[in-house]
Amino acid sequence: MTELRDRYIRFDWAIKRLLRQKANFGVLEGFLTVFLNEPIKIVDILESEGNQQQANDKFNRVDIKAKNSKGEIIIVEIQNTSELYYLERVLYGVAKAITEHINLGNTYKEVKKVYSISILYFDLGKGSDYIYVGQNNFVGLHTQDHLIISTKEKDTIVRKSPSEIFPTYILVRVNEFNKVAKSPLEEWVEYLKNGVISPDTQAPGLQEAREKLKYYSMSDAERYAYDEHINAIMIQNDVLGNARLEGMEEGKAEGRAEGRAEGRAEGRAEGKAEGRAEEKNDIARKMLANGLSIEQIALITGLTEQEDRKSVV
């Protein structure tokens, strides 16, 4: 019964239903503090493409857009199934966030840094790590040094790396995590993957999550809606998994058929080649019987002298 009582709500459901409330900002702030490796204080939750609850929700993508105390924009997105051109859509979402949060007439100084965190439950591609970070830097073509930008802040010239200005992309490949959780980052990824939170966790945000994201803290109606959400994800994953298996079987069948066809074609080609070679050997033997030298036979048939000698043995 203890295990049941320690069951926790999935993070995508929490983002959609609970973490937008100011009283629950502690969970989200802890998550961002760990993944961005700096203290994060949320001052506002902004409207985003996927944060409305819609009747035709397919449970595929959930996102939340927040603004921190420095005015920077943070997008957290959870993607349950694969999507064609996923990175292109992430890029578009970041570009849209930048343009949406600068007013007409503002200078480019008002452009804010954007962090994009993607929590992925599908195989995006090949890689040995479970977290990948993408940042912009300018590297000297000949010198290989990193360009540092001079800019002005509060009448003071400061130097910045381009990565402090351009968006930062973080891809969390949840299904690739197979470690014993020791660090706060690993504890968070373990929760994202398995729904497990250690009773003695000290990871920012997870202490609050243990209290506020308990499954049995929800009402019967909320639990029913949550269970339907989980069922929808499982059904969707099963359908996609079966489609992949069927595709693989079809591919194997096509490969076998192609292999048989190629084998027949290769057999015919090899047979023809062997026939032509045997014909040349017969001609070489007849020429030798009629008194022609090995050198003359090689010149006429195109066979080497060594091949001529073999053909008459």
Feature roles, as predicted:
Residues 1-313:
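Elongated, amphipathic alpha-helical interaction scaffolds
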